[in-house]
Amino acid sequence: MGNKLGRKRQIVDERYTKPQQGLYMSKDVDIKKLKKLILESKLAPCYPGLEETPSSHHDLEECPICFLYYPSLNRSRCCMKSICTECFLRMKSPNSAQPTQCPFCKTSNYAVEYRGGKTKEEKSFEQIEEQRVIEAKIRMRQKEVEDDEERMQKRLESYSSSSSTSAATLDTEYGSAAEDDEEIVSSQESCLPSHHPQVTRDGQFDFDLEDIMVMEAIWLSMQEPGIQRNTSPDDISEKDRNEEPSTPSSSSPSGGLACAIAVLAERQQMVGVSSSNQNVNLASQNLVPDNGNNSHYNAIEQDSNHYLQGAGISYTRSDMTDDSGGETSREVTWQ
């Protein structure tokens, strides 16, 4: 009666009641209080830690903070993780005003208890728990890798679809721009004036021969008065006696004809074929004198025929009029 079942108190050597390893240089530790807690089996003794597990001691435990092996360790009340006494004193400072969190599960009011060495059941249970934790970490890692691959695949698909859409849009825009450029070029070409004279089916320039002959006659009539003024009648008679009769020179008429053709071609280049033909017709009509001056015009025409015959051109004017009084045809022959 009155007997109480309990764990037998472990006898601890006094030298293990204070830090032996010297891992942390802390002056805030109360050595007397620490000794009392160790002797009351509330904290694990401060055994010296080993860096490697000897082959003769397979029951040593590793501290997850300092990675040293000890005969026994403290256990956190929140997550049952092992920790040595020196690491616990470093984590839970007695002069700290804020509550200490568990270094493993981040639970506030971190506290530990000492249960002695682990039994076989506890060790096997810990191994199972560790295996579960490892498997969970592996699954989480695989899930992260799969998520990354899926995200990358979606990104590639979206990029390919957007690139194809942009390429189609660029092709459409390029085609429309090319069509617009072609339309602009064609409109500009149509707006530009033609710098080439109009050519007939026979490969000849479409000039009005009557206008050319009239211009040639005018040019010749302008040249004759100057020659007559500079030459006296005696000189002319003496020159006629000395010179033999010869065919009239065609250099002067041909030169005048070339000048007339050049002038008319230049006018056609500047104002266009249609407008130039109209202007030449108007000029030819203006050059024709009225009925009061027919005698003077006939004299000029006879002179022009004389010089054109010397150049090898036979010009015959045969005008035919229709009922309305308009001119219908003209004849020009070449010898």
UniProtKB/Swiss-Prot annotation:
Provenance organism: Arabidopsis thaliana
Gene name linked to the record: DA2L
InterPro entries: Sip5/DA2, Znf_RING
Chain intervals for the UniProt region annotation (Disordered): 143-203, 224-256, 310-335
PROSITE patterns assigned: ZF_RING_2
Stretches that traverse the bilayer: none
Biological process, per Gene Ontology: protein ubiquitination; regulation of organ growth; regulation of seed growth
Protein name, per record: E3 ubiquitin-protein ligase DA2L
Biased composition regions of type Low complexity, renumbered to the chain: 158-169, 245-254
